[in-house]
Amino acid sequence: MIVIMYQQLIAHFDSLGGRELKFSPGAAVFHLGDEVRLVHLVRAGTIHLVRNQADGSALILQRAGPQSILAEASIYSSSYHCDAHAQSAATTWAVERSELSAHLSGSPSFAQAWSQYLAHEVQRSRLHAEILSLKTVGARLDAWMAWNEALPARGLWSHVAQEIGVSPEALYREMAKRRRS
């Protein structure tokens, strides 16, 4: 079901006038407060939607990989409410917000595929919120691993720490504790 939904959504995106944009690792796709002009479908790489906290930490709100729509709720907003940065070399298909909005109004099949995508993203966001509500690093890590099945390569653990809302050091301590057990 989800695969079919994504295929329909991507087919609609491909039919819209847009342009391919490339981002190098670390490059900004947009910043907090920027006017929303484009909606990005990630074709390759990973782009993070990030909210920077007052204490200097960053909370990842979305890890948009291939076939993900970056900051999909931005179509309903005049400005972005967070930052987006490429975590790796990334390519997007960027569609004008106004064209996407018009297509949603004029195509029931696209509106249905869009609604299904948003519903799936709500489910993922609820899981993320649940992880962040857990009190211990261990509980957060357990919940994250239940959803993702395995940790990424060791060099990417700091990304997991950001995603579950803990410092990299706290995650490393938890990992060391588990290795000793």
Show the residue positions of the predicted features.
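Short, flexible helix/strand-to-coil boundary loops that buttress conserved ligand/catalytic motifs
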Residues: 53, 73-74, 96, 104-107, ...
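Cyclic nucleotide-binding regulatory domains
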Residues: 27-88
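A short hydrophobic beta-strand segment most commonly corresponding to one strand
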Residues: 90-99
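A small-molecule sensor/coupling module
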Residues: 98-136
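Cyclic nucleotide-binding regulatory module and flanking cytosolic helices
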Residues: 1-27, 69-70, 75
